[in-house]
A protein has these predicted regions:
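Early-domain small/polar-rich strand-loop-helix modules and first-structured segments
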Residues: 1-46
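Nucleotide/phosphate-binding catalytic cleft detector across ATP-hydrolyzing
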Residues: 46-162
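Phosphate-binding glycine-rich loops and adjacent basic patches that engage nucleotide phosphates
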Residues: 25-40, 67-73, 102, 166, ...
Length: 174
């Protein structure tokens, strides 16, 4: 399975018609953080779907692209080879407000739960353990990961100076 820039590059290299191009929604992060952005998708059959801005999506809307994205991530994560995971931590771009973070957590919870096997979903004792919560911002999460990876653990009176440049979907955070 290819992810991120490698997947996008392969996808765009292999597009041979505009139907495939316009049926692809590749700006989820930007759409989620824009209050008045309405997105129009055209599927391969030519059907047009107009999405409200992410914060204005309701259960009456056709679908939630973030929930669908979380579902596919869940299918990749939760399988026979990897096992089943019930605890998730999401990191967010620095400029995402509390409302967007809460909505993203809800979308991810619905999508990830849909990716779980029915036997897990129907077992109230197991599904009760399912949790998803907001962690650190993306740059802070990377810094924590890097410190752990390189075995850098400061003493209580010691400081480790570092810089993280996060070149994201339309922003650069430091």
């Amino acid at each position: 399975v290819l992810v991120s820039h490698e997947a996008a590059s392969k996808f765009y290299d292999e597009i041979d018609d505009e139907k495939s191009y316009y049926a692809t929604f590749n700006e989820l992060k930007q759409w989620a953080n824009t209050k008045n952005r309405h997105q129009i998708l055209i599927d391969k059959s030519g059907n047009r779907v107009k999405l409200n801005s992410y914060l204005n999506l309701t259960s009456k809307d056709t679908f939630d692209p973030i929930e669908l994205y979380a579902y596919y991530l869940g299918l990749y994560i939760n399988n026979y080879n990897n096992g089943i995971y019930l605890h998730y931590t999401l990191s967010f771009p620095v400029n995402y407000g509390v409302k967007i973070q809460e909505k993203l957590l809800n979308s991810f919870e619905r999508g990830l739960k849909k990716s779980l096997p029915p036997t897990i979903l129907s077992d109230s004792n197991i599904i009760e353990e399912f949790e998803i919560y907001a962690g650190a911002s993306e740059p802070a999460a990377y810094a924590i990961s890097a410190l752990e990876t390189y075995g850098l653990e400061p003493n209580s009176n010691e400081e480790i100076e570092y810089g993280v440049f996060d070149f994201g979907g339309g922003t650069t955070d430091f």
